[in-house]
């Protein structure tokens, strides 16, 4: 059973305020070896040193310990994926403690590597995580309307060692698959994140005009150290230190960092609560780009007209709100690797004069011209409220994204070097969003009903002309939706002798009919020969669907409350979306 306990204390005086909170949570999990235990504490303190000067601190810390059954850190195996694909009727564990095999009875050798119960118990030990976040701030108010703020935030994350014991299928002895020995691993992962920001705010009224202005700057830095050491052949399953193992000691480690610097400003104008204007400008620099391309500039503005405040609409009693909106703005995205714009090398061994030499090899290509991906959004909208019960919004928008960061296929001459992302495409999204809500009361029962709907159509407006890019089944081609599926079309499932006769006839007419894709057997798909050459090849693939982003999304919510009792329900859905499962587990 799960435990969750919290205690809060708050108080203070006219000048000093404090809040202290502590929490303990213990969730044993719904499966073996999947529990999580956490201690957390929070302290908020602020003091008004002078009428014009306030200082404060917010501190938060957690210490969590999780069992590692669901974290297959020795591989990329996904427990839930294999759970869905496990052979029906499997004996997960025999009375003598051995784990059952997932193979068909005729398979040799038998294997329990994907037995989900074994997967839960493969990994023994705990991962302990300490996370501390502290924020210090100060606020100056030199005169009415002007506020100056500054803050510094520090986050420290530390994950302590883990270890692994893997078990043999037949005799229940410790082993790693294929090695016949046990293994212990210690990992340390330290992350430090710092953020500094400063803000200057000013607000004033001139006649019926309210003016609010903000300027500021911020800087963020991130550093990560990761270290791992391992040894094999544990002398005892009860001893989990590195010195308790006797063979094949290894060690590895990495360091990475990135930084961001930003300047920004905003002005809000409000005339008589009728006419609204907001203008923004921000400049961001990211260490993930070369100096020449590091800065991105992103302006935006919005206009609003509250028509219900106009004199000519005051007499419409059933109209509570009618607001027209228009906006235009840009946003930046720097979602690339920390060093994609740089050449970097990795230690690599090679043979020279019949001796093993230690050297360096370039394992990744660079793209020094990488820069910000930028989205430009134009939006028109209406907010309304009627009869003090019905409210809603309607929005129509166009979003053009330029310089999209994507990975392009590399020519074979590049070898096995990793290819960085490029600013290689432009995509346009156009759509409409609608939401409606009804709030009412029947007797002492309050209830609400609401719904939302959106339609979005996207198209690649610029890429490489008629040239396409494939990532699995996701295709990028100018004039098509992004990530439209490019797949073989299924003609039938081979079930009868007549179906198999078609396969045999194709192979008789052309021995290479199934050279690229294996010859289908009973229960397999027979794909369509689209180009009519008698072979099933990539040339028979077709475009399917509207991409991996849904064209239509919708939702419905309703609820009620009565004398302290409440009920609510949310239903959500999406349609006109296509994607392909490429990675599926086997029963081996």
List the predicted regions and their residue ranges:
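Solvent-exposed loop/turn segments connecting transmembrane beta-strands
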Residues: 30-32, 287-292
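Surface-exposed loop/interface segments of Gram-negative outer-membrane beta-barrel transport/assembly proteins
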Residues: 1, 30-34, 40-131, 149-261, ...
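Residues on the lipid-exposed face of transmembrane beta-strands in outer-membrane beta-barrel proteins
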Residues: 7-11, 41-47, 134-140, 198-202, ...
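Transmembrane beta-strand segments that form the barrel wall of outer-membrane beta-barrel proteins
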Residues: 22-28, 277-286, 328
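Predominantly transmembrane beta-strands of Gram-negative outer membrane beta-barrel pores used
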Residues: 4-30, 42-48, 56-58, 151, ...
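Glycine-rich, aromatic-lined ligand/substrate-binding cores of catalytic
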Residues: 548-577
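Extended, hydrophobic alpha-helical segments in both membrane/secreted and soluble proteins
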Residues: 41, 263-267, 275-285, 296-305, ...
